[in-house]
């Protein structure tokens, strides 16, 4: 099935609109194919459920695996970053990180511990861990974010009505990291509760992102 696993299995949507996304994405021929990378799925606070887009992608991408955390509901920064770093350092191929929410914070804070190459990172809905109003409050222990370019290509996708991060804050974070910033419109936290099980636009964007990475 290659071709970015048939563009994340026909853009991960059973509806006609997904056919359009698939046809657009399928035009891209990959410089980096799924088989060339270890794709690390890094969920956020409380993990990603069975219908979450991360879980769906994991089931459809042959080299994808989840970074598991010992405690999903009471995250400890050191534990989470160590889990991410261990997954990167145990990889046999260049790594592509696919992180959502607090998983973005964990991945970014783990960078100093990386000993293996990371080809790129696909970051969705990063939380504002510097905001004292964030709940639960212990999520602030994952901040502050480094304000310097990341050592690998990255995309940040953010919503205009994310309850965990103001749009302008996400845009500023992406600029500091040197990330390509994508405005997802009013899409909540881009999670299961916001309707993002099937996510054809995300699948298409991820497929294009992989084509732009070096194998």
Regions found by a protein language model. Name each.
Residues 193-205:
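Post-His helix in hydrolase/transferase enzymes
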Residues 156-158:
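Short beta-strand/loop motif that positions the catalytic acidic residue
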Residues 98-103, 107:
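Gly/Ala-rich beta-loop-alpha elbow adjacent to hydrolase catalytic centers
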């Amino acid at each position: 099935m290659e071709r970015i696993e048939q563009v994340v299995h026909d853009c991960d949507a059973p509806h006609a609109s997904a056919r359009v996304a698939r046809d657009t994405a399928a035009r891209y021929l990959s410089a980096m194919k799924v088989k060339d990378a270890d794709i690390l799925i890094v969920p956020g606070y409380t993990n990603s459920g069975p219908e979450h887009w991360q879980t769906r992608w994991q089931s459809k991408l042959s080299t994808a695996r989840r970074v598991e955390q010992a405690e999903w509901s009471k995250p400890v920064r050191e534990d989470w970053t160590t889990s991410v770093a261990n997954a990167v350092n145990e990889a046999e191929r260049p790594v592509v990180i696919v992180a959502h929410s607090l998983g973005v914070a964990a991945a970014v804070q783990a960078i100093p511990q990386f000993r293996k190459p990371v080809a790129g990172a696909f970051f969705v809905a990063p939380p504002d861990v510097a905001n004292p109003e964030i709940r639960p409050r212990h999520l602030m222990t994952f901040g502050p974010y480094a304000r310097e370019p990341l050592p690998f290509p990255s995309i940040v996708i953010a919503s205009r009505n994310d309850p965990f991060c103001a749009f302008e804050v996400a845009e500023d974070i992406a600029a500091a990291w040197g990330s390509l910033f994508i405005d997802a419109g009013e899409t909540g936290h881009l999670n299961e509760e916001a309707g993002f099980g099937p996510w054809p636009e995300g699948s298409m964007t991820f497929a294009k992102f992989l084509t732009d990475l070096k194998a």
